[in-house]
């Protein structure tokens, strides 16, 4: 069996070898997610599945671990291919912030971190305010793992290629894989962002944590000549902000996925997101695992090649790239 464990960045080596892409979820019946054709500046996309298609496939499974339309949409948002429905309204609000005498700092909650909104929008990380309660909340979700019994139950429901699930025994569940993406974003932002402690330690109660985050930002605003603005896609969090008089912006999800083009970088990110959140996908003749036995780092993926010629070419290019990287040549 031809396999390679790679980093997310090394996905580009695989993408460079295929002009046309077809990505499917192998545990659903004939479930092609999208096709893409490479152009000079990126990829021409064609989304192939809608909400009804996902719901029909999910109906054959008793577990909430199977991919949903919302999961697919959030992978596209996190890759920067689609945006929140009211993103234009947020840009207008940004113009209003520029006229304030106070400096504005943007504070993302957990879901906005998962969507990588601040990175995708090019927000200066020095204008970001991180509450460590958010980090604690994310980290508490990182290590929920499948038991052998849970995998056995999933395999009973899966009628197609259920042997792929063997890789998931004692590996991260979906909510933990989602947390991995959020924690990556947090760690990247904190290099330059302002980070503050919560007014109390985080708890296992999400609603209580939301209150801690909002009250922490409100206290920060009172103590400093700065204005924090909480960014969220959670209406309950927005309601708390209203109650506390905290500046905020509530992002809304689009009703449906509308995407026909993406950059090369966004495609690389999308493949990584899908492999992580769906657990396993197939790109042309390559099975890509986001979670697998022996995984050591969040950004690792395992590629399983079903085409010997593609494997030989990929393996050769991977070795060359790694040799150049070891010499400090990028």
What are these regions (language model features)?
Residues 1-108, 112-228, 235-330:
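Feature 3881 marks metal-assisted phosphotransfer/nuclease machinery
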């Amino acid at each position: 069996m031809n396999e390679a464990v790679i980093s997310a960045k090394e996905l580009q080596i695989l993408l460079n070898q295929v002009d046309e892409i077809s990505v499917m979820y192998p545990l659903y019946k004939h479930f092609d997610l999208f096709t893409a054709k490479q152009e000079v500046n990126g990829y021409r996309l064609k989304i192939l599945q809608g909400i009804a298609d996902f719901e029909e496939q999910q109906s054959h499974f008793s577990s909430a671990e199977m991919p949903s339309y919302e999961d697919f949409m959030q992978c596209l948002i996190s890759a920067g291919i689609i945006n929140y429905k009211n993103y234009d309204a947020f840009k207008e609000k940004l113009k209003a912030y520029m006229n304030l005498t106070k400096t504005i700092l943007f504070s993302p909650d957990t879901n906005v971190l998962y969507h990588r909104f601040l990175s995708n929008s090019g927000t200066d990380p020095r204008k970001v305010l991180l509450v460590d309660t958010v980090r604690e909340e994310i980290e508490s979700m990182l290590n929920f793992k499948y038991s052998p019994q849970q995998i056995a139950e999933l395999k009973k429901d899966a009628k197609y290629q259920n042997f792929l699930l063997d890789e998931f025994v004692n590996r991260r569940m979906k909510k933990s894989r989602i947390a991995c993406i959020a924690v990556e974003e947090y760690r990247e932002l904190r290099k330059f962002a302002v980070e503050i402690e919560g007014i109390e330690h985080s708890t296992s109660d999400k609603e209580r944590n939301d209150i801690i985050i909002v009250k922490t930002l409100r206290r920060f605003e009172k103590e400093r000549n700065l204005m924090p603005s909480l960014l969220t896609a959670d209406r309950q969090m927005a309601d708390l902000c209203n109650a506390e008089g905290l500046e905020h912006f509530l992002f809304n999800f689009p009703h449906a996925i509308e995407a026909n083009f993406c950059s090369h970088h966004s495609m690389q990110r999308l493949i990584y997101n899908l492999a992580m959140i769906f657990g396993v996908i197939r790109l042309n003749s390559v099975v890509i695992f986001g979670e697998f036995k022996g995984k050591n780092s969040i950004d690792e993926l395992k590629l399983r090649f079903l085409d010997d010629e593609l494997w030989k070419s990929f393996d050769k290019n991977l070795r060359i790239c790694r040799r150049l990287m070891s010499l400090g040549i990028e």
